[in-house]
Amino acid sequence: MGTKWTEEQELAINTRKCNLLVAAAAGSGKTAVLVERIIKMITEGENPVDIDKLLVVTFTNAAASEMRERIGDAISKALEKDPSSKVLQRQLALLNRASITTMHSFCLEVIKNNFHLIDLDPGFRIGDQTECELIKQDILADLFEDMYAKDDECFKDLVEAYGGSKSDDNLNSIILKFYNFIMSGPWPEAWLKDKVEEFNINSIEELEGKKWIEVLKESIILDLNNAYSMLTQARDIAEMGGGLEPYLVNINPEIIQVEELKIALSEGIVKFYNNLMGASFGRLKSVRKASVDDERALEKTKSLRDESKKIIENLRDNVFETSLEEAVLGMKKMYPLMKCLSGLVIEFSNRYRDKKREKDILDFNDLEHLCLEILIDKDEEGNIKPSQVALEFKDRFEEVLVDEYQDSNTIQETIVGMVSRRDIENPNVFMVGDVKQSIYKFRQANPELFLEKYINYREFEDSNRKIMLYKNFRSREEIINGVNYIFKTLMSNTVGELEYDEKEALNLGASYGELNEENVEKEYIDEIENLKVAGDIELNILNKAGNKDYSDEDELGEEEEDLDSIQLEARIIGKKINELMNPEDGSHYMVFDKDLGKYRKIKYKDIVILLRATKNWAETFVDELGTYGIPVYADTGTGYFQTIEIRTILALLHIIDNPMQDIYILSALRSPIFSFTSEEFADLRLLNKDKYFFEIIKEVVDGIYDESISKDLKGKCKYFLDYLNKWREKAAYMPIDEFIWFLYSDTSYYGYVGTMPNGVQRQANLRILFQRAKQYESTSFKGLFNFINFINKLKKSSGDMGSAKILGENENVVRIMSIHKSKGLEFPVVILGGTGKQFNKMDLREDILLHETLGIGTNCIDIKKRIKYDTLQKHAIKKKCELEVLSEEMRILYVAFTRAKEKLIITGAVSDLEKSCENWCKASASSEDNRINPGNVLKGKSYLDWIGMALTKHKDGDAIRNIGNGDITLNLDDKSNWSFKSWDRSELLETNNNKKEKNNIDIFESNNWIESKKDIKEVIEIRDRLGFKYKYIESCNTPSNISVTELKRAHQEEEFMQESYNIIDNESNEENKKEKIKRKPRFMEERQEEFSAAKKGTITHFVMQHIDLDKVTYIDEIREEVLKMVKKELLTEEEGKVVNVFKIQKFFKSDLGQRMLSSYKSGKKVYRELPFITEIPSSIIEKNLDPKIYGEEKVRLQGIIDAFFKEEDGYVLLDYKTDYVKEGEEENFINKYKIQINLYKDTLNKILGEEVKEAYLYSFYLEKELKI
């Protein structure tokens, strides 16, 4: 019995003689439809098409192989039914010749068959990516050397503007960025020259009609609509009475003002700018709370009005930070620099092309561009037309079928146009894909190509037709309903680039059947009532502020967290997995197995954890889930170069190339190959402290130090030197791959690592290094030195490689993967983790932004004045790129949701759940109908923000609305079911380590294995050893070095414990100690869109340290000082923007600030940010120490004193604080820092040799001084 196709699928399979776009949603069976269409074309009808007359373009090689295999299987099955069919026999014979291929492979075939047309050596090869990167670096170095030799002024200005302070690396990166970007288009040089000319502008009038101006207008109208919506909502609330009528005096004119701005914008950017500069929001009329019926209505009205005011002010102060005249002058000023830069990019491109021709190599960009060169000609007027080769392809291919069309880029689109009849008679292009799953912008995928056809093609018979497949055959109804709810609420033309409405919604196509005795595994037939399937979509939120007395998010940010939120979230996931695998109520969670045709108990391999990015997350998840006894595998793509076996071999290669490298020689000697000990290293170093280890080893072997070292050590040194000399000789003539395998064999290291834990994996890693060496041997580089450079470049360009993959598809483990890698796959249970992670907008902060349609967005840089600011064009491009980034994030979220077949669990973390829920409710309340308006969706900083906003409108969102005090109209028609749980930190502090230890003790104490008195004696001895307690255990808990902050925190924890419990003995104190997990250093963390309170505090301290005390009287002076720090690159632009100059001025106007300035102006020195190290008695840290034993023991204390200054009668100490402080809680605040300030006083007393007369805290939050 054949497959039962839906009506829409039948149309997609059978429709001919047109350009056909098939919009196939997730799980709609598009691959099956595509295969069936091909099968019918080559086997049915009066004149079946030979399969080699079809061009089938897939996105990956794996997809091409699968397609070929499925077509082959279908033909073979048909032949079984009709063995005599000549048509089927012919198609099977032609299958290997069929063009079922990726675009790159097709281009390669075109080039190989037509190399003579482009003067290409037929012996060319595809260059290794790292080899090509090395060639690029060499070319850049030569190019810059030549440019410096020319002493070109424009080039020097370009270096000054973009080169960086210490090297040209930044400008190198910009050139490579331009090159890689333009090569994704069909006409790179023409595009670049055209976009540079956009800077050659002479008047304001020329702005109108520019594409980027139109985009800027679209962005502005979005902001104006948002402001208008908020003001009208504020007006509606105020008009309801209740004492809010005075607000209408402001709000009604402001509504008119926004309407006038919208009209002005429609008349042109100049008119709008003039109106915007005249726009103002007056002081809101005061309303006494006592006269208001509903205080919440008052706050909501004020909030809506304030938000709309901020939108207008942002347009005026940030987007139009310069006048239109200055904007035009700025672009004109940048024209010579952009022309110089484009010239460098073109020169680099030409040199790189020539070098590749010289070496007879091509890269992947060449494949598409050279193919296009073969496929096009130009007429006498320079117009592009198909070449003879292209015309032959148009005749040859009966149809061109493009899979995953949403991921095509512009050059690929051009190639398809050249080999097909898309734009002429008898159109023949079949395109299938789903624009909602276009997630490869970083590969220059252009979803607009799909969208343009999606909008313009018709759903009925026409030369350009579209068919929509939205029946999902993958997921349960519970998943379908959840997906539809979230994306109907969030996805729009603005964010997602497509309106997700009823037409776009998924329709249920999968049939799972009821859970009953007939379709369940035999062993569970008697437990039908005790079996579970599917269930609600679950949202689990980690509240990082949970169980802490934080009344403001700033306070949370200022103090370092005790637990890393990634680890805590992993624990939530661990608990959820264990709930599925072994429910506490004794039930069993079941999934449907298609192969069995029935329900079975869930296995670990049914579960996948999806993350936006696995870096920094997957390793932590693996470690944490392991403590829950969960088998888990993560293909992180990293960690390869950090494995001990690879580090050892690379160390050997380094010293074979150059033994004068102590780090590498110590690594090699310490390895099992030579087994030197630390004591032996010390002995060698003591022989000579100035020479390299290699030189010392040679002298040892030569007998110079015979009286100073043992015979064993001399023997080891000789053994090492003999092997090293042998290897250096062989490395000089052996190919590097053969030499590496020789090393494995000669050292027996390959066999040795196989005996280590995880030995199979380690040997696989060594084989990968061998394969890498083999690839290197096929490049134009030779020798060990260049191979080491090759590996170093590989590390730098790729960051790292993943370890060798030895895991089979059927291994029973939970898999962790990125959402991108999950595309095209499906899993019974999907756990979407890390949804609280902020969107990565780092690319938007770069000096130069590039956009295929809008061109080049750069800062205006005044080299002489040393200032830079965004051009108006950059504002427009930045806004467009941000919309595209967020649209892609929306589509990535859609891909994640639609991987789930039966169960979806979502986890994420927020700093403060109450604040997050409030923000989600605000976004929802200010959005009309059942959708979140696009302006509010754009404010979301993470997937969790989006999901949270959507659920505020859902009937199951009570918990979120209650926490966020939301008064929101609900979408009561939705059928999806959601459950919500917030997790406090305290619920997750307990790890499974205690359980593991207890299990080990239970096993140990079970004496079933004791068979003799000898065994008993050994048990007692082992217990005695394990039970040994060190006599001076207290001193082990006392650090030798401690910072003031750590000491302060330790005392605060102790005080908290004493307040909570009257008496805490040692045992309970141990049980209640907070679990500490090391966090990554700040520089290793991904940069967030907004600065934390702690970071803002650090910036404030930095400004207070470096600000010129002669320039702190006026706001403008302080602003100028901050700007100087930004220009000198002491602060980044973003850091400069968060400096609160008003708060700083308030300090210097305070009594304490005036005393500091008075001291400074009288010639006395003001000390700022003074680091110190001193000694304190260890009893201050650990009060349990016996003074008789530890009385003389000292601990080093280190810290930094913010400021102190001299007055006539003594010194004044000052410490700045940026913490949040409640009014009236100053005393608690002082107590919190009293230990710290007293330690500072004692230290200064020692340093200065006289008493510090006064000590103060200055609270920037309260804007006042607090005397200690």
From Swiss-Prot:
Key word ATP-binding present: yes
Any single biological process term in GO: double-strand break repair via homologous recombination
Binding site for ATP: 24-31
InterPro entries: AddA (IPR014152), DNA_helicase_UvrD-like_C (IPR014017), DNA_helicase_UvrD/REP (IPR000212), P-loop_NTPase (IPR027417), PDDEXK-like_dom_sf (IPR011604), PDDEXK_AddAB-type (IPR038726), Restrct_endonuc-II-like (IPR011335), UvrD-like_ATP-bd (IPR014016)
EC number: 3.1.-.-, 5.6.2.4
UvrD-like helicase C-terminal domain residues: 528-824
Gene3D superfamilies in UniProt: 1.10.274.50, 3.90.320.10, P-loop containing nucleotide triphosphate hydrolases (3.40.50.300)
GO molecular function, one term: ATP hydrolysis activity
Function: The heterodimer acts as both an ATP-dependent DNA helicase and an ATP-dependent, dual-direction single-stranded exonuclease. Recognizes the chi site generating a DNA molecule suitable for the initiation of homologous recombination. The AddA nuclease domain is required for chi fragment generation; this subunit has the helicase and 3' -> 5' nuclease activities.
Family, similarity comment: Belongs to the helicase family. AddA subfamily.
Protein name in UniProt: ATP-dependent helicase/nuclease subunit A
